[in-house]
Regions:
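An N-terminal assembly and electron-transfer interface module characteristic of large anaerobic redox
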Residues: 1-298, 317, 422-429
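Conserved phosphate-binding/catalytic loops in two-lobed NTP-binding clefts
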Residues: 252-260, 376-377, 524-543
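Gly/Thr-rich phosphate-binding beta-strand-loop-beta motif of the actin/hexokinase/Hsp70
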Residues: 293-317, 392-411
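Short glycine-rich, Thr/Ser-proximal phosphate-binding strand/loop in the N-terminal lobe
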Residues: 301-334, 338, 413-416, 420-421
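Glycine-rich phosphate-binding loop plus the immediately following alpha-helix
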Residues: 331-332, 409-453, 547
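Glycine-rich phosphate-binding loops at beta-strand->alpha-helix junctions
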Residues: 362, 499, 503-526, 538-541
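Glycine-rich phosphate-binding/hydrolytic loop that grips phosphoryl groups
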Residues: 430, 534-554
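Adenine-nucleotide phosphate-binding core of ATP-dependent small-molecule kinases
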Residues: 465-498, 538
Length: 554
C-alpha cells in the first residue's frame, strides 16, 4: 500500500498496476516523533503525516512539491525509510500545455522508478480501461432548507464536517486541497497526457500560477452559501494571507479556523464552528412554547468556565431572580451541580420549578441536567445586550481565553475572534503573576492603580513574562509598577483582538478579569473609550444562556 497526500498525485496510475492507495489524513494526539526529527515550525500537517507513516506499514509514500514543509518531510522519510518507495513528484505551478507536458514526463519518470522498485509493470492500455471504469467522486451541492456552509483554505480533516453535520448544516462546497472529487479526463489518443491534463485542471491550490483564476472560482462558489469556514494549518504559509484578502471583498460571513491537526484542539474547533453557525441563524434556538399557564415560569442559564461556574435563574419577565458563582474544580460536572443547588437555594425554588436549562462555556456538553447547550460567544452577545442594549463590542477575558465579539443592534453576533491557544492575558495568567508578586488576585489590580513608574512587559508568553517579572523584582522594582506593566501588557493583547472585529462603541468588558481595576483602566486607555461593566461581570454568559432558555419556552 502506498500513501499519498495531494490531489495532484497520479493515484489511478498506481491503482491500475494493482497497488492499493490511501490518502494520508493524520489523526494524532501528539507529535512525539516529529519533534525529534523535524524543526518546531514545520507545518502541523507535515508533522501529522510523519506520525501516521511511523504508525502504519506503508510500502511507500508519494509526496508533491507543494511547500517547503513537505520537502522537509520528504528528507526525513527518505532518510528514515531507505527501504521504502519515498518519492517526491515535482508538480509544476503552470497548468497550461507546457505544464501538462512537463508533468506527464515527470509522472513517466516516477512510473519507471516504481517499476524498478516493485517489479510491477505499467500498461497504458490497462490504465485506459481502468480510468474508463472509474466512477467520478460525488460532488457537494446546496441543500434547500438547510444552513449551507462552504469550506476554503488548507486541507481539513473530517472532524470539521462531522461538527457541521451534527449541527444540521450542509457542506455546499469544499474547496480545500482534497475537498473536491478527483477530475479524470479520458483521452484514448493521448492516454497519459489527457489524464495529466485532468489532474492539472482541478480547482487550483495556492501554489499554482495566478492565471489559474482561483479568485474567480471562489467568487462563483461563494454565492451559493450562507457562510464560509476558512481553514488554515498551524505554521502553514500558503493560505493565511488569502483569508485576509478574501475578507476584504467577499460578501459572505467568514470564520477563520486554524488547527494543529491533533485531537487536542477538538473542543476549541467545536466552539468556534457552533458559534459561527449560531451567528448565521440566530433563530435556530427558538422553540415552541412550553408554558405552564398562569404560573410564574423560571429558566436557568449555566456557564461552565475553566475558573468559575456561573448560574442564573430568570423569570418569564426577564428578571434575574438569583445567581451563583462557584469555583470550577477538577470536575466540571460537580461544579455545575454545586452551582445549580446554590442558585436554587438562593431563589427559593426546586429543580422541578425550572422549565428549561441552557448550558454554555467550555464545559457545556458535560452538564447532564441541561436541556440544550449554546456557545459562550452567542450567550455573551445576548447577555451583553440584555444588560446594555447600546453595546456593540465586547471584550471577554476569562480564566483560560480571551474573546472579542462584535454585535449588531439586536445583540446578534456579527463577528468574533478568540485567543484560546495561549494562557497569556487571561485570568490564569494574572493568578500566576499575583503569586509571583506575593499579593492576592484582588490586590493586584488595586495596587496597579498606585503605580508611579511606567514599566513595559515586553513578553506576552506567560512563561517568559513570569521570568521577566522575576527579573524586575530582582532589580528592586515596586510591586505596583510591575502590576501596572502587566495590566498594560494584557490591554495591548486585548486591543489586538478588538481591532480584528472592528472597534464600534459602546464597549463592554465581561469575565472575571473585568473585576480587575488595573486591567480595566489599561484597556480604557488603549481604546480611548470607557468600558461598561455590569455589577457581576462573570454572569453575563449565564444570563445570555437564560435568555436563550426563555426563547424556548415563551
Amino acid at each position: 500500500m502506498l500513501g499519498y497526500i495531494c490531489k495532484y498525485a497520479p493515484v489511478e496510475v498506481f491503482q491500475s498496476m494493482g497497488t492499493q492507495m490511501e490518502r494520508i489524513e493524520p489523526d494524532v494526539t501528539n507529535f512525539n516523533q516529529a519533534e525529534i526529527r523535524m524543526h518546531p515550525n514545520i507545518c502541523s500537517f507535515a508533522k501529522g503525516v510523519l506520525e501516521e507513516v511511523m504508525k502504519k506499514d506503508y510500502e511507500g509514500v508519494i509526496l508533491t512539491t507543494c511547500c517547503d514543509s513537505i520537502r522537509r518531510l520528504y528528507d526525513v522519510l527518505k532518510e528514515g525509510f531507505p527501504e521504502k518507495f519515498i518519492y517526491m513528484l515535482d508538480t509544476p505551478r503552470i497548468t497550461k500545455e507546457a505544464g501538462i507536458a512537463l508533468y506527464e514526463q515527470r509522472i513517466r519518470t516516477m512510473i519507471w522508478e516504481y517499476e524498478k522498485f516493485s517489479g510491477k509493470t505499467f500498461d497504458e492500455k490497462k490504465f485506459l480501461e481502468y480510468i474508463k471504469d472509474k466512477d467520478q467522486e460525488q460532488q457537494y451541492a446546496r441543500k434547500q432548507g438547510a444552513l449551507n456552509i462552504g469550506i476554503l483554505g488548507a486541507r481539513a480533516n473530517d472532524s470539521m464536517k462531522e461538527i457541521l453535520e451534527e449541527n444540521k448544516a450542509n457542506v455546499a462546497f469544499d474547496l480545500t486541497c482534497t475537498g473536491l472529487g478527483r477530475k479524470i479526463l479520458v483521452d484514448e489518443k493521448e492516454i497519459l497526457a489527457g489524464y495529466t491534463r485532468g489532474l492539472l485542471s482541478q480547482f487550483p491550490c495556492m501554489r499554482m500560477e495566478q492565471a489559474a483564476n482561483r479568485d474567480e472560482l471562489i467568487r462563483r462558489f461563494a454565492g451559493s452559501v450562507d457562510g464560509i469556514i476558512y481553514h488554515t494549518v498551524q505554521f502553514c504559509d500558503n493560505y493565511a494571507y488569502e483569508y485576509a484578502w478574501l475578507k476584504g471583498w467577499l460578501d459572505r460571513p467568514m470564520l477563520l479556523l486554524e488547527t494543529d491537526y491533533t485531537r487536542q484542539s477538538s473542543g476549541q474547533i467545536r466552539t468556534r464552528i457552533e458559534a459561527f453557525l449560531e451567528s448565521l441563524a440566530p433563530e435556530i434556538h427558538r422553540g415552541k412554547p412550553t408554558g405552564k399557564g398562569d404560573k410564574t415560569m423560571y429558566v436557568m442559564g449555566i456557564d461552565s468556565g475553566s475558573t468559575s461556574t456561573n448560574a442564573v435563574i430568570m423569570d418569564q419577565d426577564r428578571k434575574i431572580r438569583a445567581f451563583s458563582v462557584v469555583r470550577t474544580g477538577a470536575k466540571s460536572g460537580v461544579s455545575a451541580q454545586k452551582a445549580l443547588e446554590e442558585v436554587l437555594e438562593k431563589a427559593g425554588l426546586a429543580r422541578e420549578d425550572i422549565s428549561w436549562i441552557v448550558s454554555t462555556g467550555y464545559g457545556r456538553v458535560s452538564i447532564s441536567f441541561a436541556d440544550e447547550n449554546v456557545t459562550e460567544i452567542s450567550c455573551h452577545g445576548k447577555g451583553a445586550h440584555y444588560f446594555n442594549p447600546k453595546i456593540r463590542t465586547i471584550l471577554d477575558i476569562g480564566g483560560q481565553d480571551s474573546k472579542a465579539i462584535h454585535l449588531n443592534e439586536k445583540g446578534e453576533v456579527k463577528d468574533f475572534v478568540m485567543n484560546d491557544k495561549c494562557a497569556a492575558g487571561t485570568g490564569r495568567f494574572l493568578e500566576m503573576i499575583a503569586r509571583t508578586l506575593e499579593v492576592s488576585l484582588d490586590e493586584l489590580g488595586a495596587i496597579a492603580l498606585t503605580s508611579t513608574e511606567k514599566i513595559e512587559i515586553t513578553s506576552m508568553c506567560s512563561v517568559f513574562a513570569e521570568s521577566e517579572v522575576i527579573s524586575l523584582i530582582a532589580n528592586n522594582k515596586e510591586k505596583a509598577d510591575i502590576a501596572d506593566g502587566v495590566c498594560h501588557a494584557i490591554a495591548n493583547k486585548a486591543f489586538g483582538l478588538l481591532r480584528r472585529v472592528g472597534m464600534e462603541p459602546d464597549f463592554m468588558m465581561t469575565g472575571g478579569v473585568a473585576k480587575n481595576p488595573g486591567v480595566v483602566r489599561a484597556v480604557e486607555e488603549k481604546i480611548g473609550s470607557s468600558l461598561y461593566i455590569c455589577e457581576e461581570p462573570e454572569i453575563v454568559g449565564a444570563a445570555g444562556a437564560a435568555l436563550y432558555a426563555l426563547e424556548k419556552v415563551l
